[in-house]
Swiss-Prot record:
It is an enzyme of class 3 (hydrolase). Binds 1 Mg(2+) ion per subunit. Its cofactor is Mg(2+). This is dITP/XTP pyrophosphatase. The keyword Metal-binding applies. The active site is at residue 67.
């Protein structure tokens, strides 16, 4: 791929995707005046397809969308597909983290297991009947308080036992090798024709 539209306006996702997709030229949809698609799907995969199709149809170019979020099994999968708006539509990362920590306040260490899930959809064109779909999972534990300034979203409370730090304390070089998004993009690369 020489050029691709990124079907997101999330600055954190744009930065990570640009790093992970280099040397492909990544054009954020906002640069073309394309607004976010309405996320009406009931799964990460459905939302990734909706977003990629929306951007591809308006740009008339291939588009890649990522729909990802945090899944906490002890909270019945919350925040899940609502991760970005867990504390409300106008919520920011800090609000969402506080909502999560509040809901988990009385949970034991065993109940704090969590994972990030990423679904990526690549549409060659708006009517692509066979979009490429790839997924990745990144396991961790929800800490009791935020720590670290790297990354975005729930990274400050996503603790990685093997690294003894949160995802927000990891250098970008390491996170971009082990994250859910990195795993999904590696899977996508394997699906691309030579």
């Amino acid at each position: 791929m020489k050029e691709i539209i990124l079907a997101t306006s999330n600055p954190g996702k744009i930065k990570e995707l640009e790093q992970l997709l280099a040397p492909t030229l990544c054009i954020p949809q906002a640069d073309l005046g394309i607004s976010d698609a309405e996320e009406t799907g009931l799964s990460f995969i459905e939302n990734a397809i909706l977003k990629a199709r929306h951007a591809s149809s308006l740009a008339n170019k291939p588009a890649l969308a990522d729909d990802s979020g945090l899944v906490v099994p002890s909270l019945n999968g919350e925040p899940g597909i609502y991760s970005a708006r867990y504390a409300g539509i106008k919520a920011n990362d800090e609000n969402n983290i506080q909502q999560l920590l509040s809901k988990m306040a009385d949970l034991s260490q065993e109940q704090r297991q969590a994972y990030f899930f990423c679904a990526i959809a690549l549409m060659q064109h708006a009517k692509d009947p066979t979009p490429l779909i790839a997924t990745g999972v990144f396991h961790g534990v929800i800490s009791v308080k935020p720590s670290g300034t790297n990354g975005f979203g729930y990274d400050p409370v996503f603790y990685l036992n093997e690294y003894q730090c949160t995802a927000a304390e990891l250098p970008a070089k390491i996170k971009n090798r082990i994250s859910h998004r990195a795993k999904a993009l590696n899977q996508l690369r394997a699906l691309l024709p030579d």
